[in-house]
Design a protein with these regions (language model features):
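Short N-terminal micro-motifs specific to bacterial/archaeal maturation
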Residues: 4-5, 17, 58-59, 107, ...
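Intrinsic structural disorder
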Residues: 1, 84, 162-163
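Metallo-beta-lactamase
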Residues: 6, 13, 20-113
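Generic low-polarity alpha-helical segments
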Residues: 7-8, 163
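Secondary-structure boundary/capping positions in well-ordered alpha/beta enzyme cores
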Residues: 11, 41, 82, 123, ...
Length: 163
């Protein structure tokens, strides 16, 4: 979203139709992902950063796992410090336990990251091989999206010297 000559950034406020939307940059799914805090409703519009069902793909190479984890922590901070209770996702139903949802997402990412690290240690060296091993219980139709996230996880593990 562009207003005027510049894009939206942290701390910007958009007023539209009687609503006040605080801009919350949430890169990770993609580099330019944004969420919008609705303080009057104790809610946050999350777009693709947090979904109403399932979990979000980190769309490598544009999306980066480190950024995504930081964005989830930023959303957790909104639940703890600013009283956000409701997630209004871009896909799926409204979620009423914002803090619980964000904590689930953080735990899920930590679990998947550990699985990917173990898969590499066990000899699965390519993103495709890691997907086949780690996502064996997931519908094959979702594997292309899973591979994007695996590529982001492998990059993260390499950057942190873990593989």
């Amino acid at each position: 979203l562009r207003l005027g000559d510049e894009g939206l950034g942290a701390g910007d406020v958009v007023r539209v139709g009687g609503l006040e939307l605080g801009v919350v940059p949430t890169p990770g799914h993609t580099a330019d992902s944004l969420c919008f805090h609705l303080p009057a409703d104790q809610a946050v519009l999350t777009g693709d950063t947090v979904l109403g069902r399932g979990t979000t793909v980190v769309a490598h190479p544009d999306g980066r796992l480190g950024d995504y984890l930081d964005s989830l922590r930023r959303l957790r901070s909104l639940t703890v410090d600013d009283g956000v209770h409701t997630v209004l996702p871009g896909h799926g139903p409204v979620l009423e336990d914002a803090q619980g949802v964000v904590e689930f997402y953080l735990a899920h990412r930590a679990h998947r990251l550990a699985q990917v690290e173990t898969a590499v240690e066990d000899g699965y060296r390519t993103p495709g091989a890691v997907v086949e091993h780690v996502y064996a219980d997931v519908a094959r139709s979702l594997w292309p999206a899973a591979e994007l996230s695996v590529r982001a996880q492998l990059e993260y593990l390499e950057e942190h010297g873990l593989i």
